[in-house]
């Protein structure tokens, strides 16, 4: 369900969306935990601002941009359709990415995954520690704002690590199905970790929801 929901959300954001009156309106998803539930690793102030302000802004701007796009589509205004693509990508990606991110975290998270996901990580990266080191390095190394990702390559049947700039969505950018995303925009950590991104990366492993990531993996590899 998780993968299908993410993939279908991505499809709804595309230019081919229906121009009928039943247009989909995106909404801010509720968090599956309280804003302070991830403390001391991610404090409540960060979570509240990140969810209720930053993510909400992506949702609102996405709805406005899609409305303008549908109007341009109805008028056959190709120039405006093209001009709106960056805003669709940025705000649509921000909505997709954060909707995954919140479920990737849990106050009962941390440790290591189990079962099929752990075996796949060992197969594709050598060990869980090597995987953790690689995803950490890729995430820390993102220049400016962006995301570090663990994704599934459906064609090759293996896990891959990738970085995406800004709010570029993983699947729309690389073709990889997103399993685990780490937000390295400064709004995700600056109020607590200042400019020390590596400390934020070290902390976030304590709240990774491996049950959620594993469920995504099982669904997406079918």
Swiss-Prot record:
Domain of life: Eukaryota
Cofactor note: Binds 1 Mn(2+) ion per subunit.
Keyword Hydrolase appears in the UniProt entry: no
Binding site for Mn(2+): 50, 98, 183, 187
Cofactor: Mn(2+)
Subcellular location: Mitochondrion matrix
Post-translational changes noted in the entry: Nitrated under oxidative stress. Nitration coupled with oxidation inhibits the catalytic activity. Acetylation at Lys-122 decreases enzymatic activity. Deacetylated by SIRT3 upon exposure to ionizing radiations or after long fasting.
GO BP term, example: removal of superoxide radicals
GO MF entries: DNA binding; enzyme binding; identical protein binding; manganese ion binding; oxidoreductase activity; oxygen binding; superoxide dismutase activity
One Pfam family this sequence matches: Sod_Fe_C
PROSITE patterns: SOD_MN
PTM annotation (3'-nitrotyrosine): residues: 58
Keyword Manganese assigned: yes
Residues recorded with modification N6-acetyllysine: 68, 75, 114, 122, 130, 202
Record-listed E.C. numbers: 1.15.1.1
Enzyme class per UniProt: oxidoreductase
Function: Destroys superoxide anion radicals which are normally produced within the cells and which are toxic to biological systems.
Similarity comment text for this entry: Belongs to the iron/manganese superoxide dismutase family.
Protein name: Superoxide dismutase [Mn], mitochondrial
Protein source organism: Rattus norvegicus
């Amino acid at each position: 369900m998780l993968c299908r929901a993410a993939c279908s959300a991505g499809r709804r954001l595309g230019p081919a969306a229906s121009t009928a009156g039943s247009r989909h309106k995106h909404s801010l998803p509720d968090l599956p935990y309280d804003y302070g539930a991830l403390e001391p690793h991610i404090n409540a102030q960060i979570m509240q601002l990140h969810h209720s302000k930053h993510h909400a802004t992506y949702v609102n701007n996405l709805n406005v941009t899609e409305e303008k796009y549908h109007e341009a589509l109805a008028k056959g205004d190709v120039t405006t359709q093209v001009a709106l693509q960056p805003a669709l990508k940025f705000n649509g990606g921000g909505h997709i990415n954060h909707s995954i991110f919140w479920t990737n975290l849990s106050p009962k998270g941390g440790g290591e995954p189990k079962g099929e996901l752990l075996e796949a990580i060992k197969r594709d990266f050598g060990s869980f520690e090597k995987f953790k080191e690689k995803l950490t390095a890729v995430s820390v190394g993102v220049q400016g704002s962006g995301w570090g990702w663990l994704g599934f390559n459906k064609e090759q049947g293996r896990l891959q690590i990738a970085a995406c700039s800004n709010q570029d969505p993983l699947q729309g950018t690389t073709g990889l199905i997103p399993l685990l995303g780490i937000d390295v925009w400064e709004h995700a950590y600056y109020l607590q970790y200042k400019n020390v991104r590596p400390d934020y990366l070290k902390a976030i492993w304590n709240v990774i929801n491996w049950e959620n990531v594993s469920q995504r993996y099982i669904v997406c590899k079918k």
